[in-house]
Amino acid sequence: MKNIGKFRFWLIILILCQVSPDLSAQESSRIKVMSWNIRLDTENDGPSQWKYRKDALCNEVILQSPDVLGVQEALHNQMKDMRKQLKGYRSLGVARDDGKKAGEYSAIFYNRKRMKAIRSGTFWLSETPDIPGSRGWDAACNRVVTWAEFREKSSGKHFVMFNTHFDHMGDTARVESAILIISKAGSIAGKLPVILTGDLNVTDKHRAYRILTYPENEVVLSDTRVRAGAEIKGPDFTFVGFDPEFVPTQLIDYIFATWDFNVISNHILDFRQNIPYFSDHLPVISVLEFK
């Protein structure tokens, strides 16, 4: 009996030695991506103001533990709050009105234990993308893109992430913004895998969406929710407002990725059981795997 017990013990040790490296390799090849319009801080939101929901929102980010997170509509004070609460993360990006602190950020947060930022930058969605605060086409607001090249520390694999927020009024601006992003992705990322997160203010029927996912582009992006197949979770909408009586219908927040990745899952996280809501948008989460 003692020999049988010893045999079982060493058999378990042998199995663990064989399985652990594979599990570690699988974990290092996967990236958890999150995109969230956190709603700007404004007194007009009354009981749904940032000061009443910031702790719950940051706690949700910590709970979900994304490797990279693209946020939209963050004002400078909101960036400071998130940096303070998200201890394991660093952030990249500048405000859209002056390239410093004025206006909204479309910032990127990243898990500093898993990811190393190699290079990063900003461009504006306009005819003069390198001029801070420039406004493009028929847009109602200045719009910005934050990008960064990351190296996943365990695997050594690189990718480039772009995060943005398209204009809510200018239809030409949304179309031209999509064209510009594809062009910039090609020049910035080259042959590296690409991830694009953002609130695009369009549905999948809009021309801007079709431009981003056009299969003949220099950088071919795919909607990770479309590719997730059976691993889709959550509702088919992302804009929910703050009124529990509001009936949401629009899916306008996305995570796109090049075909360098397998899409393991896509989840639109429905938090509407919480009052006040964390934001007026639901976050999108995708798990991607390097091929």
Locations of the language-model features?
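Short, solvent-exposed loop/turn elements at domain surfaces
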Residues: 40-47, 71, 118, 171, ...
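Bacterial N-terminal signal peptides
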Residues: 10-18
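Solvent-exposed loop/turn segments at secondary-structure junctions
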Residues: 38-41, 75-78, 96-100, 114-115, ...
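Metal-dependent phosphoester-hydrolase catalytic domains
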Residues: 114, 172, 176, 183-194, ...
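Active-site beta-strand/loop signature of hydrolases that rely on acidic residues for catalysis
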Residues: 31-38, 57-82, 109, 148, ...
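Metal-dependent phosphoester/phosphodiester hydrolase catalytic core
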Residues: 140-144, 151-175, 187-188
